[in-house]
Amino acid sequence: EIDQYLWNTGHQYGEWLIPSQTVDGADQSAAKPVNTSAYCAPIFGWNSCRIMADTAALLGHTSDELYYDDIASRMKSAIQKGLIDDDGKMPLDFMGSYVLAIAFDLAPERKKESIAGHLIRKIEENGDCLDTGFLTTRICWMRSVRSAGWTRHIKSCSRQSARHGFMR
């Protein structure tokens, strides 16, 4: 039941241009056997189904709304059970995975604090610099604007330096 609703098979681009995964501006993550598609594809797949359900509701297409809402609910459950471990860790210990789980409110209530803790740990380990790719950097900014609780994140976004890859 879980694997069926984790859209993580076949070719997936995942997140790319993560500074720590680049070498002189060339993205190296595609060469890795396990890349960010382990979390990007399932989470953005869930988001697409959620958007479809919301759109169907706006258009008054009740049967389509129920259909996509059911898929989105099953996908959210699969993400919570199959991607987020008991300690709130994601399949790849990348900042972007935690950003998406927080921003899309996919974490079960009992794991929200530990997921936020993993994100803060990753930021601290990286010298208070962000290490997110093009998919999650925008989400980081949008989330920090809406949440006064992301003061560490705001500090990392305002840094004038970068530590890895093409941003050296």
Task: Give the predicted meaning of each segment.
Residues E1-R168:
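Active-site core of glycosidic bond-cleaving carbohydrate-active enzymes
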